[in-house]
Amino acid sequence: MAPAELKRPDLIVPYKARVKANEEVGLSLVSTATCMAALFLRFKLIAWVAFILTFSNLLNANTSPSSSPTSMAFMGIAALVSTYLPQFLNTPNKT
């Protein structure tokens, strides 16, 4: 007759969960690209998209010392400021 339990305790391997790969590289790259596009093109829609992406990147950032999400947030704010600043600095022409 066969034994009731076929598993040998010395052959059991405990489960180890896989370490997640760094997936936030894509979001960081897209937010940087949209910030730069907003700074160069001064297109308001791109500036708002860049601001939302950098804010999302800031909220989802890990606490690793190698990355600096606050500098990315300042870049998103700079994109917004650079698009709206000419409206406040231009004075009407005197006729």
UniProtKB/Swiss-Prot annotation:
Membrane-crossing segments per the record: 29-53
GO biological process, any: protein insertion into ER membrane
Lineage, opening ranks: Eukaryota, Fungi, Dikarya, Ascomycota, Taphrinomycotina
Cellular component aspect of the GO annotation: PAT complex
Membrane found in the keyword field: yes
Keyword Transmembrane helix: yes
InterPro entries: ASTER
Location in or out of the cell: Membrane
Membrane disposition: Single-pass membrane protein
PANTHER family the record matches: ADL329WP
The name this protein goes by in its record: Uncharacterized protein C18B11.08c
GO molecular function: protein folding chaperone
Signal peptide positions on this chain: none
Coiled coil: none
Alphabetic keyword roster: Membrane, Transmembrane, Transmembrane helix
Superkingdom in the source lineage: Eukaryota
Broad class of the protein's primary localization: membrane
Any Pfam family matching the protein: ASTER
